[in-house]
Amino acid sequence: MDFDPTLPQVVANPYPVFAARRAVEPVGWSDALGEWVTFGHAEADAVLRHRGLGRLWRLRWPDEPLPNYTLLHEHSLLENEPPTHTRLRRLVAAGFGRRQVERLRGRVTEIARGLAWDVRDAAAGGSTVDLMPLYAEPLPVAVIATLLGVPDEDRGLLRPWSNAIVKLYEPAPPVDRRRAAETAATEYVGYVRGLIDYRRRHPGEDLLSDLIATRDADGSRLSEDELVATAVLLQMAGHEASVNVVGNGTYALLSHPAERARLTADLVPGAVEELIRYDSPLQLFERTATEPVRIGSVTVEPGQKIAALLGAANRDPAVFADPDRLDLARWPNPHLGFGAGIHFCLGAPLARVELQASLATLLTDLPGLALAGEPTRHPTFTHRGFATLPVTVDRAELNRS
């Protein structure tokens, strides 16, 4: 049976499909995608690390120019290989390392606790509230906006642009989505250029000001287009992947009351890794072969694409005992939720801090949080997350806390 990630049952719950395909073949051809796909952990890891498989940007619709959408990808460190990738990553990492992110931990916790109290107020009297717009979405959006120095009054502009752009990462997006993505990219690029111009004249204590000022060893800096693409990439990761990390992780925790009951502050760091493994916010990451590459039992020929299915890798029983069980104390936990190799997620430290702060806040400020009916998922495969997440808050639990 062909692997088709657009099927509603696959979007709703891909993990049984992954398991069935993995039992037959760890790597297979997908007619629906027109590329190879991996179902095993070892094979996905090999795809992500092999230097004969690269991120080679090419617009999928050559007869339909999307100039600003293309600009954001042609100049992105995510879509380039060495030596361009090496230079971009070195410059960006200088202002976005673990040490800089750790300095944000207190602010992230402050934002999370403020949002938790908004949830408490909205749920007063036993009301059902949607946790996505009240908590899971604004937390990462506020954090990345703070990091990049985006004014508070502009934050509402950014997520709709990001959301329109990432819809083109799904298989076979229709024409109207492509046009919407280009419109969003045009507005996004224009906004970020204006913000860069302002920060050139008025540097602040933010990452964008740091990126503008950062020089490489040879004195080179990020170009204007590279600055735009980098700022948008970081914002989009904060708006999409990080939102889904918080939403998916919270749902998984609330769906497993026994695991939630055992969650204590000392378990939070490991619990974060398990929640990312259990329901990966990014399910698919592509590479293109630049030479014949052997992955498992197949040879990926030059020009062919192969997709590492990260969610499938993270449920591989050859690596994870009882992989369909949520185990907050699981260790070791070599999940591929942040990728691997030279394109390992640059924002992983920030995503971890966000989810750690989120879980700690659930423990301290929302002990009575509970699911209130079935949530709804976005109808997308590549970016896996919730559109709604209805919850209630038990006032008696709050009073006891």
List each model region and its residues.
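Cytochrome P450
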Residues: 1-401
